[in-house]
Amino acid sequence: MNDSILTSIKKLLGITEECEDFDTDLIMHINSVFVILNQLGVGEPFTIEDETSTWNEFIDSAKDYNTVKSYVYLKVKLLFDPPLSSAVMECYKANISELEWRLNVAAELKSSTTEAS
């Protein structure tokens, strides 16, 4: 969970860590997704500026880690490198919708548990 957000998203997109050609674009898209996550109730407002920001700086729950990471990857993939196939595009969108629902439910449960305490 201590891995770099930018580096891990680059790896999932098939971009080597050493290649910095797309870093500015990826950082912009990643930060846009963090705004969406915050609006869904996941995490505090958060942005990255380079490869030094790590996942555990954004999310402290190991339980939600992979869901958040998958969500950020899929959203960035659609923004940065959308698939040519409409069938693949619809599959990505369906996965994103499901992850949004699950993240929102988890955030609401966490919020109601905190309020009840």
Protein language model annotation of sequence segments:
Residues 3, 62, 68-70, 86, ...:
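Helix-centric, low-specificity signal for extended rod-like, repetitive segments
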Residues 7, 66, 72-74, 90, ...:
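Short alpha-helical segments used as structural interaction elements across diverse proteins
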Residues 78, 82-117:
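Protruding loop/beta-arch "assembly-hinge" segments enriched in small, turn-prone residues
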Residues 53-81:
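Mid-chain, well-packed structural core segment of small domains
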Residues 1-64, 101-117:
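Conserved short "hinge" loops at termini or chain/domain junctions
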Residues 28, 32-35, 74, 78, ...:
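Short, residue-level hotspots on alpha-helical faces of the histone-fold
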